[in-house]
Amino acid sequence: MDKTTFSDAIEQVMLHNWFYAPLQLIYKEFEKYRDKTWLTPDKTIQERVQRDKRFTKIWYWVYALTEYLGKLPQEKAIKTEKDKNERIHSRMQWMLIEIWNMNWYSTYTPDKNWIFENKEIWRLTTIQEIPQFTYKNIIEDSIRFVDVIWFNERWFPAKLIEVENSTDFRAGFLKMNEIQDFRTDFLFIAPEERKTKFETEKNKSAFSNIKDRCKFLTYDFIEKYYENLKEWTKLKNNL
């Protein structure tokens, strides 16, 4: 008989993810440590992280081991304009990961160094390696560098997302052009004032095959979408 409790298994997931984890990752990794034998195991997991004092909620759907709160990574202070831009970029990446996690699908980011709200952003994703959905060289040379990728339930990329705070849009378009034959949408997230630059790049002949699938969204839109989705998810879970 398996003597590992639900809380023990949750604790193991967090210990192997540097002391914290989003709920979606806990669901995914849980069975490495205990079988999901109950009728509604995911609801039981939710109940345990909310009630067991071993765990502390540190963000929406993100929980940490209470005894290790002092060991969580710390954000560096903003001292330069570069630091400010990096903080904005990491905030957007974090929101984009959370949005797809709330939809219970898989998320990926290549960035291992950025921290937001004392959480390493990549540890909020549900996968660390891109599934081999196409030729290896396309993934290794281009796709793995995309800021955020949302995968569907079949492990194909549903959306490729680039956060363009100050960099040229062209690099993002070139990455996305590599998988033009897939049914994937391409999102560019940037300040409103950069939309003209986005449209200019999108309308170049080199990107004619993907231009209709490329969408520009502002930082304000992502923030509002995130907050509304968070509230809707709370209401849905109370039904």
Language model features: what each stretch is:
Residues 80-85, 101, 109-155, 227-237:
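Active-site metal-binding core of divalent-cation-utilizing nuclease and nuclease-like domains
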Residues 135-146, 152-220:
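Catalytic cores of nucleic-acid endonucleases
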Residues 15, 101, 180:
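Anion (oxyanion) recognition and catalysis
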Residues 45, 73-110:
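Nuclease catalytic cores
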Residues 121-126, 130, 193-239:
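Domain-level recognition of nuclease-like catalytic cores that cleave nucleotide substrates
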